[in-house]
Amino acid sequence: MVLLNRRKIQPKEIGQSADSFSETPWVIKESSERINDYDSDLKKLDFYKRDIFTCEISGKDGLSYFKALKSEEQHREKVRYLLPKELRKAIANFANFSPIRKVGHLVESAFQRFSNRFFIGDTVCLKTIQKNALITYKEGEPNLVESPTIENNVTLFLVKDVFQSNGMMESEKGEISAPKLSLYLITECLNRESKGAALIVGQNEIKRPESHFSKFIIACFLNEILIKVSNKEHAPWRVKQEYIERYDVNPKCSPNMIDYLPDRMNSSSSELYTPLTIPPESDVEPADWKETSETSETSETSLSKIKAIDDEISVSFDHIYDNVNSLAYNDLKGTVDDKELPFTGPSIPFENISYLDSSLEYKNIDQKWFKECSQFPTERLLVVYQFLSFFGRFIGLSHFNFDQFLTTIKCTSPEALVDEYVKINFLKTYNSKGSFTNEKPRNEIYNQVTSSNVSQREKANVFNADESQRIPSNFTRNQKMRKFITDKSTEFVMYSIFKGKPLKNDDMEFQSYEKVNILYIDIVCSLMCLMTDNEPDWNCNLMDNWTEEKRKEEGNKTEIDIAIEKCLNYGDTSWVKLLHNKNFSNGNWLICLLGILQQNTHMIAYSDVAKCITKKILPLSMNFVNLGDELWDNFRKRLSIKDKIDVLWVLVDFASNFSSYIKELVDKVPKLCNGIRLKLDSAKKEYIKLKRQLKTLTKNRVKLHSNVSMNRYGSDECKGKVNALKVKIAYLMEDIAFLEAKLIQSDIKRLEILGKDRNGNRYYWMDSNGSSSAISEKNEELYNCCFLWVQGPSEADINFCLDVDVESLKKWELLAKAKGTAYATKEVFSIFRSTDGSYYQIAQGENFMIINSNGILMRPTIPAFIDKKIISETPEKLLLSHHQWAFFNDIEDIHMLVDRLDDLRENEGQLKKALTSKMDRIEVSYKQQFKIKRRIECDETFKKNHKLLKNNEFTFPELKRIETTCTSNGQHFSNMEKISKKLSRTKNDLVLEAILKDVAHLGECERALLKKQQNLIYPLNFHFEQLRTIDLEFIVETKRKRQEDILTKLLNHQRYKHISHVSGYGISSQRVDKAAHLDVQGILEEIECQLISRRREDEERN
């Protein structure tokens, strides 16, 4: 209907129409009016032609009456053409009784809500620009006003079907909304008809053309269907009655909007505002919007009013829903089994996936991945750390992060204290005469050039006991620096890494390294303290039916039993007494550990581990001076990293299952968490209350500011109150963040499984990560294990999800352990990946392409479930065993994982929801860990050495010169060798005189060269290009020695820094003799005191 001055007008309102009995009426065919006289007709036409009208649909003004009518019809057609019916239903249901009052905000919200949600009949295009256009619009299509122009070379598709998961509840309206991610079946379209091939795409892979979906189109549609519930202030919008049945809109009003309904339900709606007739002063958001949760009681009058209105609505509109479902536009399908959804092609492989090898070093996934994982108890390591991270503070342990935990375990092995050194060798070159030459003698000339730059400590480690043979290093530490060094090798020069000389027990550095073991010893001692209480009784409730009968009688003891008994009663002191008195000094802790392991040998769960460790740490003979030192030496040298982790796991698992003290702590934790939650809820309620007051004061301040006649003092007073409320709200936000971090920190469930993906892989996250940094920036190093871990599927999941039998799985594991996962996958499942990324399947001795390098499926048959897993994870990174553990080393890969997870899948939907809810903390944790590690490893010393290395790099001319100088140098030393031989054989004086002259000449040359070397003593950062005369050989040799020195320091720097970082723990650690009890009331009071003190500090600072 045409508008004039924001008011709807009818033709009868402009002038009097002709009498129906008039014989010669004048007819205006555009408005179907009949006018009696010619003058009235001219006046009416003149009025219609004035440019004073507004189109009710588009809002365009300055039109004549007839142009406005035509504009309305054209825009109605445009809305129906561009917006499919399902999308119009969704928008209508969203806008009906929406809490958003301002029209512009409602249009913006609708655009944001549905810009990435697609419905059947939608016209879409792929986000990637296509080179060849399949479909374009032609000139013969409907010519609409401002008809959409389609970009050239863009293929259009029609949405034919939608695969959706369970809906999510909207907090504002309580209705089901579409999921964030869906799959769509689309087909190529021409003239609004589907043709060509069909594709299945994800929600993030398609978009609507900009000309098909815009805020203007949405505004036109809302202008057509919306009307105010009433003309009361801040009344909500509703859909007009004539559109309710058409778009399946629920006409029932929510209880929180009852006050805005008109007093009489059957009152005429012709006087109600529409989006274009509402006055500008009324088109505002309410400042005193009432939340439904603000009041806990509802008066009897309100309840009766709601019931009466519901009854009236039911009588008027219930017939609409007799044969249709409510919210039919969003009738979502339930979650489906992970096997039922179609295969969408290969995924982009994760680049930064790493694992822990048997030496506790971080490594990128390689060929030895499965072998390392199958021999290393990653799960036990994580279980031990999550136990210590929570209960450590109650058993006297200071906080330590995951990297410190790994370092202290590694340093209990002598191998971890061995340095590495770098050697640079110039390769043999093929000279012009066709013979090979070696430059080794030339190296020995310049051995003195940089020997003063090597420290005494490095001299001891650079050379092995046997000077003629170096031991290549097989360490896996510092992977980035190792790769950096080995990648510097070229056809002229080779960079090699060798093991240094092992440190002896009496070395000063060995004794300084012993400090790093204090953390491991403190952990073991603290766990052993949980076994007994102050009385000489066990503090663990061991159930009789969990033990086996004693296998050996007292009179039938073996040599091992006798040796164990002597160790447990060494020095006429029982190990039980040592444990009871907490006497762990001088190696007594190992005697107590040996006794606890012996007690556990009769428990099925721990018997194998206990027997293996006992056998390894027992002395070979009883001839020793100090039993504690002997046990410690055997513990360090004979036990592997796996054995040392198993020691901690036995103690942790035993205490978790049988310790009454741990049970007491676990029982008190829920009470503590509930107390923190009460404080948190109170703070949130206060925050909501202050926000409401702030809105009210802001509204009053605007009124005072707009009214000039008001007192200025009142405006200033209102401004002061607003600023005070803002300060209080800021304090409350800090308190809420503090309490949320405390709640996370107090929760026991650290290593929780987040969910499983479609292939059965399980994901873990220690939820306390980052909580310390959120509480106090001063203790930002108190992070835990900031990694998202993924574990391979169990045997049951492999059989159920992938349809792989046990025999094939066992065969794959054996081959993967021997030759890697890629080889095993090719042999067992007959699938391999080529260098260009294509996937092939071996059948009858021939290779058939499954997926090409562009990720397109080349075969009509759908791949099997195991084939889908291989293609999605790649054969090199295939997870097919519960022994395989890996972690995401980059936050970008985690974002890629979340985007890849499918809401429709039963398992992945839960996993995606869990990851999304924790994503903020995960991002903070990764960022924090990276920052701390970089600060530790990349300190000023590292930067200085890295800069010196750049100044001493080989240039290409220098490397090329090596090839031409090798021959002359070889001839020079060969001449000296020949002269020496002649001198030893000759007896002729004349010949001898000639030889001596040659020797003197060579001696002068040598002295001149040495003098030149002595004059050329330059600092490490000196640029050799500054020399006027350049001795290329000397420069090359000097650079080589300097590079060896610098690269050796850089290679060992990371390990030095981590060891020194953990060595400081022993100074601050103070293990208590008695475990502390969890005082819930005391902790809650302490939290309250911390809140008060933080508030005072902020006030003083401000």
From Swiss-Prot:
GO terms for biological process: subtelomeric heterochromatin formation. Its main location: nucleus. Residues 673-743 form a coiled coil. It comes from Saccharomyces cerevisiae (strain ATCC 204508 / S288c) (Baker's yeast). PANTHER family: ISWI CHROMATIN-REMODELING COMPLEX SUBUNIT YPL216W-RELATED. The keyword Repressor applies. InterPro entries: DDT_dom (IPR018501), WHIM2_dom (IPR028941), WSTF_Acf1_Cbp146 (IPR013136). Keywords: Chromatin regulator, Coiled coil, Nucleus, Repressor, Transcription, Transcription regulation. One of its GO terms (cellular component) is chromosome, telomeric region. Present with 3060 molecules/cell in log phase SD medium. Residues 375-435 form the DDT domain. Residues 271-301 are annotated as: Disordered. May be required for the activity of an ISWI chromatin-remodeling complex. This is Putative ISWI chromatin-remodeling complex subunit YPL216W. It is found in: Nucleus. Residues 23-131 form the WAC domain. It comes from the Eukaryota.
